[in-house]
Amino acid sequence: MTLKIGTRGSKLATTQAGTIRDQLKHYGRDAELHIVTTPGDVNMSPVERIGVGVFTQALRDVLHSGECDVAVHSMKDLPTATDPRFHLVVPTRADSREALIARDGLTLAELPEGAKVGTSAPRRISQLKAIRPDLEILPLRGNIDTRMGKVTSGELDAVMLAYAGLTRVGMQDRATEVFDADIIMPAPAQGALAIECRADDTETVRALNMLMHADTFVSAVAERTVLNRLEAGCTAPVAAHATLDGYSGDTMTLTAGVYALDGSDQLVFSAEGDGARPEELGELVAQQLIDAGAANLLGDRS
C-alpha cells in the first residue's frame, strides 16, 4: 500500500514532506504527497488572530478521516497538548537558529536607524526590539519567496526567518546573519518536524518509528513543556532551546525566555537535568519563569 502523506502546499512544506517520503521509500515503504489547504494558507492575518492550530488542524482532520495516512507538520506549529488519536514521531532536527535576510548583505547591527524589518512572530519582535529599539517592525506573512521578495523589492530592509526553512529549500546562502540562541532564542521545537499517523494504524506506526531521532524528540519535548506549562500558544513571546551533552547525551541543558513585546523586559532561566526526563526539566524551567513573574509579560496572550 502506498502511504499518502498530508502536507501543506508551500514549497517549504512539500520539501519537508518530500524528505519524509524519501526516507520511507529508503526503508521500503512507497509514499506520495497529498496536498491539503489550511486556513493559515488562505488567511494572511497575523497567526495569533487566526488561532492556535491554524496550520495543523486541517492536516489532522484529513488524517483522522483516513483521507491520508501520515501528516507532516513543523513541530513548532503543533499544539502542545497531546492528542491520543495520533502517534507522534520526530525525525532529526535541522538547525534551530534564527536568520536575518537583509539588503546589501547587512547584519542586524549594520542596519540603518529606523530600518524596516518584517516579522509577525511576537517572540522575534520582542527580541529584535530589545537589541535594536529603533527598528520599525512590520507584519510579515506568506511563503519564503514572498517574504524574501519584500527585501529584494525594497519594501523592507530585512526579514527574520527560521534558518531551518532556508536550508531545507536550499536558500541558506541568502542569510546575511544567523543568530546563536544566546543572542536571539528560537521558538520551542524550531527546526524539528512532527510526523503523525493514526495511533491504531499499527503498520504505519512501525514504519514511522524507523524515522524517530531520540535526541531531537527529548529536546523538543523539554522545550514544548515550557510552553505548555506557561499555558502559552505557539504565537506567544516565549522561546526555548535545549542541548544535550555531546559525549553521553545523558545531561540536558534547557534555557527558556519570556519577553515583553516592546522589548523592554525579559525573563530568561536555564537548568540542567536528566536528558531521559525532558518533561521534568521543562516543568522546572517553566516554574522558574512563573515564579519570576512570566504572567506579567504574557498578559492576555497566555
From Swiss-Prot:
<keyword id="KW-0808">Transferase</keyword>
<comment type="subunit">
    <text>Monomer.</text>
</comment>
<dbReference type="GO" id="GO:0004418">
    <property type="term" value="F:hydroxymethylbilane synthase activity"/>
</dbReference>
<dbReference type="InterPro" id="IPR036803">
    <property type="entry name" value="Porphobilinogen_deaminase_C_sf"/>
</dbReference>
<dbReference type="InterPro" id="IPR000860">
    <property type="entry name" value="HemC"/>
</dbReference>
<keyword id="KW-0627">Porphyrin biosynthesis</keyword>
<comment type="function">
    <text>Tetrapolymerization of the monopyrrole PBG into the hydroxymethylbilane pre-uroporphyrinogen in several discrete steps.</text>
</comment>
<dbReference type="InterPro" id="IPR022417">
    <property type="entry name" value="Porphobilin_deaminase_N"/>
</dbReference>
<dbReference type="Pfam" id="PF01379">
    <property type="entry name" value="Porphobil_deam"/>
</dbReference>
<comment type="similarity">
    <text>Belongs to the HMBS family.</text>
</comment>
<comment type="pathway">
    <text>Porphyrin-containing compound metabolism; protoporphyrin-IX biosynthesis; coproporphyrinogen-III from 5-aminolevulinate: step 2/4.</text>
</comment>
<dbReference type="GO" id="GO:0005737">
    <property type="term" value="C:cytoplasm"/>
</dbReference>
<dbReference type="Pfam" id="PF03900">
    <property type="entry name" value="Porphobil_deamC"/>
</dbReference>
<dbReference type="InterPro" id="IPR022419">
    <property type="entry name" value="Porphobilin_deaminase_cofac_BS"/>
</dbReference>
<dbReference type="InterPro" id="IPR022418">
    <property type="entry name" value="Porphobilinogen_deaminase_C"/>
</dbReference>
<feature type="modified residue" description="S-(dipyrrolylmethanemethyl)cysteine">
    <location>
        <position position="234"/>
    </location>
</feature>
<dbReference type="GO" id="GO:0006782">
    <property type="term" value="P:protoporphyrinogen IX biosynthetic process"/>
</dbReference>
<protein>
    <recommendedName>
        <fullName>Porphobilinogen deaminase</fullName>
        <ecNumber>2.5.1.61</ecNumber>
    </recommendedName>
</protein>
